[in-house]
């Protein structure tokens, strides 16, 4: 009898562990799809900005819409980075975590920056007979430093996120002590929320609140958020993203209200959590998650060429916003080809450029 009871208890425990693993796997898959969506919005925004660099300000309503799609993307990236860090924070020692992040973040940051620099220098050499950047300026083009009057942005502009998130990982022990207690953590988040809007967009303090909020959930409410995200009932993830797109279309009108401008991080958190919780788990497994990372790192290398080509071919007879949408699609397609070719024929290069990530 006792043996039978033990067997039943063991089977129940095994079933519970399997369910927990499945719930985590489904949650992780959902986040990968959401991450890809927001990376595409970043690509769309940069496409419009690059187009305006060559052809002047775009008056197309589609262009404004493409820019507004990205408005909450960075909050999503920082929040989920904080969540994943503190979700498994006690699994590694500090130096193990830093070593892992150097390989997955800092090394790709340098390599993608150098690759972009080489291409820019080569194009300049062909077009003008001389390199665009001196040796010193080449080094500066790889940096992301903002201290007082010193202000260097990476030549591959989207990479600023990688180095900013790396600084948060470096000070993770301090952030951990800020949020490890629920009450003290909540007070710390309140202080950070009030202070974050006073910092510049790229500064250390600007995204600290959103990052720590994600970490706070990862420490104290990870089971709750994963359980909520795995609700059997809900609307499709695609439909929740369509709702987000509709909200972004209304953003210029909503942004006219001072409260929305001031509390943009709070609104971003609500929107991101809403997408995660309300959207049902996708039935399709994301098997190529590294594609999203490579798209984020590579799109600005391709963008100047694609904008010029599409502008020359279609710019005179197609709406600028439509042209920009075509650039985004072509960019995504080219990166997909590069991703698949590297993964199949140069797996070592692929893994280094992808930061050793699986997928």
Region roles according to the model:
Residues 40-47, 189-202, 239-252, 298-305:
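Aromatic-anchored segments of alpha-helical transmembrane domains
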Residues 17, 22, 209-212, 219-294, ...:
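Alpha-helical transmembrane segments and terminal signal-anchor/GPI-anchor hydrophobic tails
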Residues 1-191, 316-359:
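Membrane-cytosol interface segments of multi-pass membrane proteins
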Residues 74-87, 166-176, 194, 199-228, ...:
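Specific transmembrane alpha-helix
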Residues 62-74, 150-164, 195-213, 247-272, ...:
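Interfacial loop-to-helix transition and helix-capping segments at the boundaries
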